[in-house]
């Protein structure tokens, strides 16, 4: 019996919409990352992008447990000397609520060209509206 290997052209990708309102950040991010990789499908192949498209709405209403809202710090560096910037979860959720979910999911995807292709299938919106109704996304309960 031969091992099944999915062909990139033969992969069927569905569109799903996830409501992040009241959900815990890490728990929703792990399920989204798994769906983006395609691990929920029988034809999952590690070196082929078999995942689905995921639309996340209400990103501004995602929650974290404990004191992480004030204690969780996001760092970035400008590559110049002294260019280390930091921002707390509270401030980031006020300024760019989409970025909180994007960073959490991106950290759970593989590094490299395949991981970047998976990440491009993630669409995050701060409010309840999204502009992907033409794709007829199915509601995904997480």
Curated annotation (Swiss-Prot):
Statement: the UniProt record of this protein carries the keyword Ribonucleoprotein: yes
Single GO biological process annotation from the record: negative regulation of translation
Keyword entries, A-Z: Ribonucleoprotein, Ribosomal protein
Entry's Gene Ontology molecular function annotations: mRNA binding; structural constituent of ribosome
Residues of the signal peptide: none
Example of a GO cellular component annotation carried by this entry: cytosolic large ribosomal subunit
InterPro entries: Ribosomal_uL13, Ribosomal_uL13_bac-type, Ribosomal_uL13_CS, Ribosomal_uL13_sf
Top-level division of the source organism's lineage: Bacteria
HAMAP family according to UniProt: Ribosomal_uL13
Subunit record text: Part of the 50S ribosomal subunit.
Family under the similarity heading: Belongs to the universal ribosomal protein uL13 family.
Function statement: This protein is one of the early assembly proteins of the 50S ribosomal subunit, although it is not seen to bind rRNA by itself. It is important during the early stages of 50S assembly.
Protein name: Large ribosomal subunit protein uL13
Lineage: Bacteria, Pseudomonadati, Pseudomonadota, Gammaproteobacteria, Vibrionales
């Amino acid at each position: 019996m031969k091992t099944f290997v999915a062909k990139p052209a033969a992969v069927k990708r569905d569109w799903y919409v996830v409501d992040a309102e009241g959900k815990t950040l890490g728990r929703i991010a792990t399920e989204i990352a798994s769906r983006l990789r395609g691990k929920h499908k029988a034809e999952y192949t590690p070196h082929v992008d078999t995942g689905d498209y995921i639309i996340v709405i209400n990103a501004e209403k995602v929650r974290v447990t404990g004191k992480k809202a004030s204690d969780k710090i996001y760092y970035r560096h400008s590559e110049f000397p002294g260019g280390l910037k930091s921002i707390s979860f509270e401030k980031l959720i006020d300024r760019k609520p989409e970025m909180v979910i994007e960073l959490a999911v991106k950290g759970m995807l593989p590094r490299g060209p395949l991981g970047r292709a998976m990440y491009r299938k993630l669409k995050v919106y701060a409010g309840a509206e999204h502009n992907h109704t033409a794709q007829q996304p199915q509601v995904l309960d997480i």
